[in-house]
Amino acid sequence: MTELNKLTVADSIKGLKNKDFTSTELIGAHIKQIEKHRNLNAYVTDTFDLALKQAEAADQNYAQNNARTLEGIPFAAKDLFCTKGIRTTACSNILKNFIPNYESSVTQNIFDKGGVMLGKTNMDEFAMGSANITSCFGNVISPWKANDDNADLVPGGSSGGSAAAVSGFMASAALGSDTGGSVRQPASFTGLVGFKPTYGRCSRYGMISFASSLDQAGIFTRSVLDSSIMLEAMMGFDEKDSTSIKAEVPELQSAIGSSMKNMKIGVPLSLGEGSIIEPDIMKMWQDTIELLKNAGAEIVDITLPHAKYGVAVYYVIAPAEASSNLSRYDGVRYGLRVERENMTLDEMYEMTRSTGFGEEVKRRIMIGTYVLSSSGMDAYYLKAQKVRRLVANDFNNAFAKVDAILLPTAPTAAFKIGEKQNDPTIMYLNDLFTIPASLAGLPCASVPAGLSARGLPLGIQIIGKQLDEYNVLKVASTIESGVKHIKFEPKVF
């Protein structure tokens, strides 16, 4: 029998319904795995007591035939989802001891469906990063190793703790947030399915903000079916979020295994990527195109002429919004306060923020403050907003001809911890392929599609039309079936 912590969400639900095991046993297996792999630093706060209580309640519901859709299923939450009475820090010193008195809508939705929370996962500070190396709790180590090297690898970011938890069988699923690729890129690096829904599909209420016009809750799972199950539970209109979309939550599970006949898949002729793409990524992309052709899809050449400006646009708009959102952390209302005798209010602000924020967060606040200044507004911010509109228009034009778009998720496989740290611009290019869809607010997923020559997982990205999560899952499921001969599992696990 498969170890309980290695079961997918779908198989766990089936086993619990058949009474093959209890939720208490399932949760116990995951707790044991978490304790065994503390060195990966995936979790920053455990909620084992809560999880065991929730599991006990789930077992009672199964006994009484009152089980909900996620009854007894273990999940983890990125540490920017506020959890009532449970520490929520965004992995920043400025919020290191913050305990919210309210629950985020997304975690509440999962609790309402019977989900069991194992804990809060590590992340880049305030979700700013691509390698999970800016957390005040230390970096996360990927469960994966290259087959020619034993060096520790990054899990991707900013949702690296969630990716490591699911990839390392320390959770069946895990919540992340995706602003410019923070679910999709870690999913690619760790051999997982990572899904970012349409902007507004999942409520942002109770999510600690980075860039409000881009932030969206996402999910990590080990199968496309699991992704559809979790998305159905997470999504839905929320009057507490002004950007929430008033649309029915679709039935998504029927997308799994659907025919690709008459599906048109767009492949961009160029994104101006040059030599940044590793050869392994190019081969995986071409192999996936052939896979979809053989499955009955029609491949259509498309152009996204403004996508090449995506990274530049993102690193104007996102820091601008961050500088505004993070201005609330001033040492007065909540979070860290640094003070000394005879200190003025301005000095207290300065000391608190300079002590509480890490270097990358301070860098982005400064960039954002500048582009919103009188000298930067016209030169940078307003121009970036105009180009953002052009990027969205490019997608609209493409989707007049195709049902989905296929791109690599990241230009490289996972890299060693410590690499690319000295030059922020090199790190920013990790999001080269994920940012354009974020700027347009589109649903997209990364699904494992191959292994590099060094044995590391490579993800392919599927981008769909607004509110068309169904077709994204349909294409992802076809790719998953086509590469089922590849085992996307870290060797030591």
Curated annotation (Swiss-Prot):
A single BP term in Gene Ontology: translation
InterPro entries: Amidase, Amidase_CS, Amidase_dom, AS_sf, GatA
GO cellular component: glutamyl-tRNA(Gln) amidotransferase complex
Short name of one Pfam family: Amidase
Name recorded for this polypeptide: Glutamyl-tRNA(Gln) amidotransferase subunit A
Quaternary structure, from the entry: Heterotrimer of A, B and C subunits.
Function, as annotated: Allows the formation of correctly charged Gln-tRNA(Gln) through the transamidation of misacylated Glu-tRNA(Gln) in organisms which lack glutaminyl-tRNA synthetase. The reaction takes place in the presence of glutamine and ATP through an activated gamma-phospho-Glu-tRNA(Gln).
PROSITE patterns assigned to the protein according to its UniProt record, in alphabetical order: AMIDASES
Catalytic reactions on record: L-glutamyl-tRNA(Gln) + L-glutamine + ATP + H2O = L-glutaminyl-tRNA(Gln) + L-glutamate + ADP + phosphate + H(+)
UniProt GO MF annotations: ATP binding; glutaminyl-tRNA synthase (glutamine-hydrolyzing) activity
Active site: 78 (charge relay system), 158 (charge relay system), 182 (acyl-ester intermediate)
Family recorded in the similarity comment: Belongs to the amidase family. GatA subfamily.
Enzyme Commission code(s) on record: 6.3.5.7
Keywords annotated in UniProt: ATP-binding, Ligase, Nucleotide-binding, Protein biosynthesis
Database matches in SUPFAM superfamilies: Amidase signature (AS) enzymes
Species the sequence originates in: Rickettsia africae (strain ESF-5)
